[in-house]
């Protein structure tokens, strides 16, 4: 699959369309496409079907999902420029098949670890990161059973982290209630 099916006019057309949506203030967060307005994906394809990116633009759907998620995150001003930045960064004819694994590797090994405190969570990030590293180095997606094992371990780490966070919040509620009752006594 080649980006824009190796046709620069496809890129020019979508950039013009996205610019028109931005200038008309039709880029909005929270829904795909409704009444002539939508999110990054919605204004690009006038639907929420990320798979259309593959057929219409030669862009893997996982990148459309990532574009979508990133659009919803920042403040409105920079978010409205994001669809043009995203589509504008893609060279017609580019093979984008390794962009997702490279992004995921960066995210798991460079960006997220700085926010992780628990050893089990760090181990889960490392395990999944190792699979993405292998994918990036060999250009071959590791076998499904290896992803499933990593997913299971990551899910267990996430559940443990969520339980710990919930316990922490519960103790905060316990403390608040106790203070309330002490003050009322």
Tell me what each language-model feature is.
Residues 1-156, 167-185:
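Short, glycine-biased loop/turn motifs at secondary-structure junctions and
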């Amino acid at each position: 699959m080649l980006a824009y099916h190796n046709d620069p006019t496809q890129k020019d057309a979508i950039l013009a369309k996205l610019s028109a949506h931005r200038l008309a203030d039709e880029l909005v967060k929270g829904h795909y496409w409704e009444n002539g307005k939508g999110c990054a994906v919605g204004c690009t394809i006038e639907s929420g079907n990320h798979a259309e990116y593959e057929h219409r633009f030669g862009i893997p759907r996982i990148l459309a999902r990532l574009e979508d998620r990133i659009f919803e995150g920042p403040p409105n001003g920079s978010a409205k420029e994001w669809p043009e930045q995203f589509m504008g960064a893609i060279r017609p004819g580019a093979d984008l098949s390794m962009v997702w694994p490279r992004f995921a590797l960066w995210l798991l090994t460079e960006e997220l670890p700085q926010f992780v405190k628990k050893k089990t969570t760090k181990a889960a990030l490392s395990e999944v990161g190792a699979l993405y590293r292998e994918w990036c180095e060999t250009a071959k997606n590791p076998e499904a059973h290896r992803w499933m094992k990593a997913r299971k371990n990551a899910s267990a780490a996430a559940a443990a982290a969520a339980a710990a966070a919930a316990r922490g919040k519960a103790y905060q509620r316990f403390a608040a209630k106790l203070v309330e009752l002490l003050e009322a006594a």
